[in-house]
């Protein structure tokens, strides 16, 4: 569905490549990112991201005078495959991939800007030209910036979601995004009926016998 690869070259070996492919199936570039085992970007390195076109230029294999680089939304190549889907846009490619895993692409199709400041009308042109409905899902610390960007873009079928701010908790951190919220809500241990009773009654703990009774009788606490 998405085009994701792995670098095998030099000091970027093992890095993830997020390929930017446009609505005409043309490869614009690939963004290379270094991640730790926990899935977070490896900021311990001298640098932790790069672009394929920049690496080619450095190696003398890209003539910047002959080719004009213009990035596009990650996932844009899917726009015509799911013609009725609402377009959901986040900042991170990784987040788009995770969010899509929880959604039907016929209803919600996730894309990424590949950078907070990359949200511009030019990037959204292929979607605007198709009159698609677009919902922005900014990171927790980037909400106001994307609200301002949406106002500048001035497209009537563009809105900014409040979901990240609505479901955010302090433990998520200021850099949390929609994927972080989804993973926490979906993967969190389910509350037992005994725990629910304890919470609703404002108790620190519930008597073991009562908890056992709730479990044995399969009681539901409303």
Which residues fall in each region the model found?
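Generic alpha-helical secondary structure signal
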Residues: 6, 39, 51-55, 73, ...
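TOPRIM fold recognition
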Residues: 84-85, 94-222
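Low-complexity, polar-biased intrinsically disordered regions enriched in Pro/Ser/Thr/Gly
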Residues: 3-11, 38-41, 166-169
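Phosphate-handling DNA/RNA-contact segment within nucleic-acid enzymes
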Residues: 11, 17-130
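TOPRIM metal-binding catalytic domain and adjacent DNA-binding surface shared by DnaG-type primases
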Residues: 1-28, 79-84, 197-222
């Amino acid at each position: 569905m998405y085009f994701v690869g792995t670098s095998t070259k030099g000091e970027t070996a093992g890095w993830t490549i997020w390929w930017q492919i446009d609505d005409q199936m043309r490869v614009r570039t690939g963004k290379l990112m270094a991640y730790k085992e926990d899935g977070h970007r490896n900021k311990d390195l001298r640098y932790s991201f790069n672009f394929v076109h920049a690496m080619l230029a450095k190696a003398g294999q890209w003539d910047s005078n002959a080719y004009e680089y213009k990035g596009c939304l990650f996932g844009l190549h899917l726009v015509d495959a799911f013609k009725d889907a609402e377009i959901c846009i986040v900042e991170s490619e990784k987040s788009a991939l995770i969010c899509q895993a929880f959604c039907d692409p016929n209803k919600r199709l996730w894309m990424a800007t590949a950078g907070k400041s990359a949200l511009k009308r030019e990037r959204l042109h292929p979607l605007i030209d198709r009159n698609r409905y677009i919902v922005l899902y900014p990171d927790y610390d980037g909400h106001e910036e994307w609200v301002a960007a949406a106002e500048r873009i001035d497209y009537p079928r563009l809105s900014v979601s409040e979901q990240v701010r609505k479901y955010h908790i302090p433990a998520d951190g200021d850099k949390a995004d929609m994927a972080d919220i989804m993973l926490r809500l979906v993967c969190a241990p389910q509350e037992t009926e005994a725990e629910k009773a304890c919470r609703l009654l404002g108790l620190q703990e519930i008597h073991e016998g009562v908890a056992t009774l709730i479990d044995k009788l399969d009681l539901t606490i409303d």
